[in-house]
């Protein structure tokens, strides 16, 4: 268990109304088996994909999600919970089953990315934990992947610790950013916890602490000859910064060491080109340029289109906070429950006055369809008892507009929801996070190659097809006809 998440293992890490509902279910004798879906309705950043992250952290927490004696005492002090219910909570733990997409997978609106099978009270109490962990990490992994793609898959240095929302926000963001494509972090605790390469150069305060910029660079190069990246914009990038960097860099080269420079202000497009010329003319074509300063995927894309000769990108605020979007819109909705009369599982559906908030009823699976070239062509949401097979033509329907449909024969089919926990326990041995996040990151990079570039555009991406099967469409319509 990672240190920064230990406090969240208390089952008090839930919205208060989950507990008031739970007591209501307990009093009504309604703790029967149910199924909940986690899905989302819209990609963040007006994008064409999202990167699923946080499920491994979530499962770690679920495995020890209990009420301590002090937790129960706190609830008793609220004056609304009965002693019998509080006794029930003393033995509470998650004993259900969890299905989910693999971490690092690309995910799309409407499809269930997590499915929970549990007794009603358990399923209700764990809602906040699941959404808290998966929403934030998915947001940051998605943002980072967009930054990484905008850079042309160059090195992305995560510099966000000081701008992140608290310690947990910084730690979760560091983890998710690595899954999304960052190659290193300035967060030293994150580097230790997750086995991510630690990275950092110097601040302006280093330069200002010496009588001259040249002396500051010389001192740094003497201490860190194999990792000298000079911040060249403290005074004047072109008149002094780059010239002093070249003077010190020449000595490093003579000793067999390379060096780089960092730009943190000004017209990055212009300055990076001028700095590149200076470095090349001085005989250092392999000296590298790193830039920072409130970067976003849009800014990076614009700099790339201007021909800015940047080798790596230090991205902080906008990557670890989500920038223009502060949250991911994952929701947790019941899709099936036990019929008290028959004891069998029956589908349920939220219809809503807003058609876009209607849910898909029943226990469902998700299949990803691929063509003969191994390219993803669409995701299909089907009922649990349906099997989508390769080489067979099916008709698939728009999840909101029943008269829109298409037919497709897949060359290969991948089931996306996989059983990860049974009886509240992980299936298989837990993989430590330093190894797990590398598996998740590789899954992200592998899946990116299976999606056409049109889905990955930063602006105006093509919409990837997510459809429902004919049987699910018919079930959904049967509910709608009654209201």
Regions found by a protein language model. Give the residues of each.
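Alpha-helix initiation/capping motif
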Residues: 15, 54, 67-71, 75, ...
């Amino acid at each position: 268990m990672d240190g920064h998440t230990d406090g969240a293992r208390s089952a008090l890490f839930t919205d208060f109304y989950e507990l008031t509902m739970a007591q209501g279910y307990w009093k009504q004798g309604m703790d029967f088996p149910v199924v909940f879906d986690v899905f989302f309705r819209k990609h963040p950043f007006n994008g064409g994909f999202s990167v699923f992250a946080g499920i491994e952290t979530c499962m770690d927490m679920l495995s020890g999600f209990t009420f301590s004696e002090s937790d129960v005492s706190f609830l008793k002090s609220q004056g609304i919970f009965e002693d019998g219910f509080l006794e029930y909570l003393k033995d509470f733990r998650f004993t259900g089953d969890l299905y989910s997409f693999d971490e690092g997978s690309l995910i799309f609106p409407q499809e269930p990315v997590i499915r929970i099978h549990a007794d009603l009270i358990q399923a209700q109490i764990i809602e906040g934990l699941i959404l808290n962990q998966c929403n934030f990490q998915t947001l940051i992994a998605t943002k980072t992947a967009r930054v990484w793609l905008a850079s042309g898959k160059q090195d992305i240095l995560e510099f966000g610790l000081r701008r992140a929302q608290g310690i947990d926000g910084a730690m979760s963001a560091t983890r998710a950013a690595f899954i999304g494509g960052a190659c290193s972090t300035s967060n030293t605790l994150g580097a230790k916890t997750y086995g991510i390469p630690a990275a950092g150069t110097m601040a302006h305060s280093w330069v200002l602490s010496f009588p001259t910029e040249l002396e500051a660079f010389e001192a740094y190069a003497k201490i860190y000859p194999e990792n000298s990246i000079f911040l060249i914009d403290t005074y004047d990038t072109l008149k002094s910064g780059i010239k002093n960097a070249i003077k010190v860099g020449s000595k490093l080269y003579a000793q067999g060491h390379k060096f780089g420079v960092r730009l943190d202000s000004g017209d990055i497009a212009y300055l990076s080109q001028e700095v590149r010329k200076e470095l090349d003319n001085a005989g250092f074509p392999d000296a590298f340029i790193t830039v920072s300063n409130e970067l976003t995927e849009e800014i990076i894309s614009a700099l790339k289109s201007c021909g800015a000769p940047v080798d790596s990108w230090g991205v902080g605020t906008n990557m670890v906070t989500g920038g223009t979007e502060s949250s991911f819109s994952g929701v947790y909705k019941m899709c099936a429950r036990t019929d008290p009369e028959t004891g069998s599982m029956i589908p349920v559906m939220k219809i809503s006055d807003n058609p876009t908030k209607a849910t898909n009823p029943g226990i469902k699976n998700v299949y990803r369809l691929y063509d003969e070239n191994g390219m993803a062509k669409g995701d299909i949401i089907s009922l649990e008892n349906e099997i989508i097979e390769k080489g067979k033509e099916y008709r698939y329907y728009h999840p909101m507009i029943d008269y829109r449909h298409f037919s497709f024969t897949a060359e290969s089919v991948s089931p996306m929801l996989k059983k990860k926990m049974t009886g509240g326990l992980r299936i298989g041995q837990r993989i430590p996070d330093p190894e797990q996040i590398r598996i998740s990151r590789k899954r992200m990079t592998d899946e990116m190659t299976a999606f056409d570039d049109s889905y990955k555009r930063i602006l105006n991406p093509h919409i990837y097809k997510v459809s429902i099967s004919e049987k699910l469409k018919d079930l959904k319509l049967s509910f709608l006809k009654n209201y």
